[in-house]
C-alpha cells in the first residue's frame, strides 16, 4: 500500500478534490459545525485542505491561511460570507492547546458537530509524537467537554490524528480472546515478540 499526499495541504482552488463533503452536508441541513485546528501546525491532517471548495473559501476569506506561514486567528464574522472557511481556518491560534475549544464550551458556543485536529506534537505520528502524547491530548479534550454535561450531551466530537500512517496501522490491533469449540483460547497476535518489538514506544 502507498499514500499519495498530493492534496494534504492548502493550495490553489484550481486543483483539488471536488465531491461534496460532510461539513457541506451539515451546513446545508442547518447543523452547526466547526473544525478546531492550529494553522499552520495541523500536521497536514485536515483532508478538507485538498478540496477546491475549501481552497476557494480560503482565497475569498480575506484572511487566507497556509501551512507555511503564521496565520491570523479565525474571525467568526467571515462565516456569514464564507461558511466553509472555518474548516481550514486558524481556529485554535493558541498552538492547538484547546483554548478556543474550552472557551466555546464555557460560552455555550460549541457547535453541534466539532472536529479536532491535533497539532504535530499530539498527532501520534512516530518521531514528533507518541501514543502517550495523543492519549493525553484526547484526555484533555474529553475533560473539557465532560466538565459541562449540557454541552456534552448535545455535540458530536470527531478527533483527527495523523491521516493514514502512524501507530494505528503499525501495531497489531488488540483482539478479544475467544475460545474455539475445544475450549482453546484464541485472540493473540500471530507475530512473534521479536517481530513486533520495534513497534513499541518506550
Residue ranges and their predicted role:
Residues 1-202:
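N-terminal pro-sequences and low-complexity stem/linker regions of secreted or lumenal proteins
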Amino acid at each position: 500500500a502507498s499514500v499519495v499526499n498530493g492534496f494534504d495541504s492548502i493550495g490553489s482552488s484550481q486543483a483539488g478534490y471536488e465531491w461534496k463533503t460532510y461539513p457541506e452536508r451539515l451546513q446545508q441541513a442547518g447543523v452547526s459545525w466547526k473544525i478546531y485546528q492550529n494553522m499552520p501546525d495541523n500536521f497536514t491532517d485536515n483532508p478538507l485542505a485538498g478540496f477546491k471548495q475549501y481552497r476557494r473559501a480560503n482565497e475569498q476569506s480575506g484572511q487566507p491561511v497556509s501551512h507555511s506561514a503564521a496565520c491570523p486567528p479565525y474571525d467568526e464574522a467571515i462565516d456569514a460570507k464564507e461558511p466553509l472557511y472555518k474548516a481550514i481556518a486558524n481556529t485554535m491560534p493558541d498552538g492547538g492547546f484547546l483554548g478556543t475549544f474550552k472557551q466555546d464550551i464555557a460560552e455555550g458556543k460549541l457547535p453541534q458537530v466539532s472536529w479536532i485536529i491535533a497539532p504535530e506534537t499530539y498527532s501520534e505520528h512516530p518521531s514528533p509524537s507518541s501514543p502517550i502524547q495523543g492519549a493525553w491530548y484526547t484526555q484533555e479534550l474529553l475533560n473539557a467537554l465532560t466538565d459541562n454535561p449540557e454541552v456534552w450531551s448535545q455535540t458530536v466530537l470527531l478527533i483527527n490524528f495523523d491521516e493514514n500512517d502512524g501507530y494505528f496501522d503499525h501495531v497489531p490491533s488488540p483482539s478479544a480472546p475467544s475460545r474455539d469449540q475445544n475450549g482453546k483460547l484464541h485472540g493473540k497476535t500471530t507475530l512473534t515478540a521479536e517481530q513486533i518489538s520495534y513497534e513499541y514506544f518506550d
